[in-house]
């Protein structure tokens, strides 16, 4: 550990260069009872973080078969943690989400593109 010259405070190194590495391989994920029921009709507006997901089909063959839990979501990517960490683009994949009651919901990634808070405002056609 190095010292800061002027203020004489201890400096520690920055955070991990690989985020989410500390939870790789764990079988649990935080799932509170406050979560609403996820159904096929409301999954577009629902929070995806914490749901179990599997990539069923993709334009890129390297993404097919990835499965784990969603730990982060950006506008165009899902961060999935299973036995390692993957950043999967939403628009080129078809995802299969598993709900708490064991139901499996397939949804094309194009329907999920956008920030989670902006998806609430967007109007969707029935599908």
From Swiss-Prot:
**GO cellular component terms, semicolon-separated:** cytoplasm; ribonuclease P complex
- Reactions catalysed: Endonucleolytic cleavage of RNA, removing 5'-extranucleotides from tRNA precursor
Q: Name one GO biological process term.
A: tRNA 5'-leader removal
Q: What is its EC number?
A: 3.1.26.5
Major enzyme class = hydrolase
Q: Which GO terms describe its molecular function?
A: ribonuclease P activity; RNA binding
- By its UniProt entry, which Gene3D superfamilies does this protein fall under? Ribonuclease P/MRP, subunit p29
Any idea what job this protein has?
Part of ribonuclease P, a protein complex that generates mature tRNA molecules by cleaving their 5'-ends.
Of which family is this protein a member? Answer: Belongs to the eukaryotic/archaeal RNase P protein component 1 family.
Q: What is this protein called?
A: Ribonuclease P protein component 1
* Species assigned in the record: Pyrococcus abyssi (strain GE5 / Orsay)
């Amino acid at each position: 550990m190095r010292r800061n010259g002027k203020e004489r405070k201890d400096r520690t190194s920055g955070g991990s260069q690989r985020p989410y590495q500390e939870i790789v391989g764990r079988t649990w994920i935080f799932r509170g009872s406050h979560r609403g029921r996820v159904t096929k009709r409301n999954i577009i507006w629902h929070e995806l973080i914490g749901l179990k997901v599997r990539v069923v089909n993709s334009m890129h063959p390297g993404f097919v078969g990835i499965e784990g839990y969603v730990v982060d979501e950006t506008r165009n990517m899902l961060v999935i943690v299973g036995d390692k960490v993957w950043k999967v683009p939403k628009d080129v994949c078809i995802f299969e989400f598993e709900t708490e009651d064991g139901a499996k919901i397939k949804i094309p990634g194009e329907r999920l593109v956008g920030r989670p808070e902006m998806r609430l405002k967007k109007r969707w056609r029935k599908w």
